[in-house]
Amino acid sequence: MSDSKPPKDSSSPSAAVPDVAAAAASSTPTPAPVAITPPSNPQSAHSFAQAQQRLIARRQTRDAQEAARVAAQQSESQLRARIAASQSPLLRRLGASTLSLWDTISSREGTRPAFRVGQVDAELLDEELVELMKGQVGEAVRYYGGGGGGDNNIKHEWDAEISLALRAVIFKLTIWDHDATYGAALQNLKYTDARHTGSVLVPPSKWQKGLYGLMTVGGRYMWSKWENWLREQDGGYDEPSPTVQRLSSMTDRLSTLHAAASFASFLVFLLQGRYRTLLDRVLRMRLAPPTSQVSREVSFEYLNRQLVWHAFTEFLLFVLPLVGINRWRRWLARTWRKTKKIMSTTGGEGAEEKKGEFAFLPERTCAICYQDQNQATNENELMAAATSKTGVVGSAQTDVTNPYETIPCGCVYCFVCLATRIEREEGEGWNCLRCGELVKECKPWSGDVLEHESKSPAQKTVVFADDVKDASDDEQENSQVLVQQEDDDEYPEEEGEEGGEEEEEEEEGSRSLEDLRTESASEESSEQEADSEGDESEDYEAEEEELGADLDED
C-alpha cells in the first residue's frame, strides 16, 4: 500500500478557492524596481520627495483594491459553489439568474446603454414637433368651417384626421426613410434591430418599421376615434345602453393595463437603457448611436447668453420708469431740433419771424390732428395731396373742435389735442406747430367775441337812462298807491261806481307809459348814434315830469 493521497477533484468547491486565488496572484503584475536619482536643487528635492510619497500611496491603494477584488471573487465563487450544490432545481435556476443580473449591473461597463436622457429628449422633441405643426395647421384653417375661431371650425371637427396626416408624413420622412426621428437625429441616435448582438449595428427590417408606423400612427388614430364614439354614445342625461357600458368598462381596463405596462417598461428602461417604450420592447427596436466618433459635449453658451439677456431686460424694465425715459427723450429731441435749426440758419436770418412746421395750414385746420393723420410736412406736399384728393386738410377729421388758443402766440388748436400735448411735456413747454413758440398754457379762443371799447371820461360822459327810468317808475307807482288810498278814504260809498272808471284810467296810464318807454328807447338809440346823449336825457326827464303831473291831476 502506498501512502500517496488521491488527487483532489478540480471541480470541487474547496479546490476552486485556491485556484482562483493563485490565478489572481499570478495575474497581478509585480512592479519592477525603478532607480531614481534625486535632484541636487533643494526645492526640487522637496517636490521629488512629495512625488515619491504620492506614488507609494497610489501603489498601496491599488494593492488594497486588488486584495478586495480577490476576496470578493473568493466569496462569489463560494456562493456559486453552494448554489450549484443545492438539491433544488428551482433554487439553482433562480440563484444563477440573480447572480447573472448582478454581474451585469455591477460590472464596469454595465448594460452599455445609449444615453437615457438623450432617448427621452428625442421623444419629447418629436411630440413637440407634432404639436407645433398641429398649431400651424389650426391657424391656417381657423376661419374655415365654423368661422371666427369657434368650437365648430375644422380644427376641432377634424383634429384626429389632422393628427393622423401629420404623423403619417413625419413617419415616412423620418423612420421609414432614415431609421431615425427628428429628435433622435438631433441626439445622434438611430433605430437598430436589437435581435442582432454583433458589433455592427443592423437597421430594423421593413416589417418592424411597418408595424411601428401602424401602431404609432394608425393605432393612435383608431383609439382616439373609439374614445370619441364612446363619449358620443354616453348621451349626457340619458343612461347609455348596457353594451356601451361594457365597452366603456373594457376600454378603461385596457387603458389602465397599458399604463401599468408602460410604467414597468420605463422602469426597466431606466435600469438597462435599451428600450425606451413598450412598443420598442415588443418589436425589439432600440435607439443607439450610429457612430462612436462623435463626442458628446455640453455647451452652455446659448444658455448663458439667454440668461444674460434676460437679466439685462429685467434690469431695464426696472430702471427705465425711475429714470424717466420720456423726459430724456423729449429733451434730446428738443436739443436736436435746436441744433438743426442753428446749423441750418445763418447770422442774417436770425431776425426773421419764427415759423413752425405746419405754418402753411389754414386757420380752421388743427395742426396736431393734421400731424397725426397726414404725412405731408410742407406746402408742396400739401398741394400734391389736395390735387390727388388724398389729403385730409379740409375734412372734418382735421377741423378744429372746441377751439383753444395758445399763450402767448395765440394759435388755435383743438382743446383735447392742445391740452394733451402740454400735459405730456410735464411743465417743460411744447413747441407750437404753427409758429414755433414755446407754449406752456392755453385758454379758450376769443375770436368770435367782440369786446366793446370803453370811452375815456375826459372826452365824453355817457349817462344811461335805464337808472333814471327805474327811479321814475318807482316814484310813479308810489304816488299812484297814495292817491288811490286817499280816494278810498274820502269816497267809500262811490267805490263801486267809480271802480270801473279808475281801472280804465290805470290801463290807459300803463299803456301810455309803455308807449313812452318804447319811444324813449328808440330815441335813445338814435341819439347815441348821433352823439347827442346829453340833450336827449334832459328832454326825457322833462317828459317824465309832465307825465307825473298828468298822473297827479288824474
Swiss-Prot record:
GO terms for molecular function: transferase activity; zinc ion binding. Its EC number is 2.3.2.36. It is a multi-pass membrane protein. Residues 9-38 have a biased composition (Low complexity). Its main location: membrane. Residues 1-63, 470-554 are annotated as: Disordered. It is found in: Peroxisome membrane. Residues 509-520 have a biased composition (Basic and acidic residues). Coiled coil: none annotated. The keyword Protein transport applies. GO terms for cellular component: peroxisomal membrane. Belongs to the pex2/pex10/pex12 family. This is Peroxisomal biogenesis factor 2.
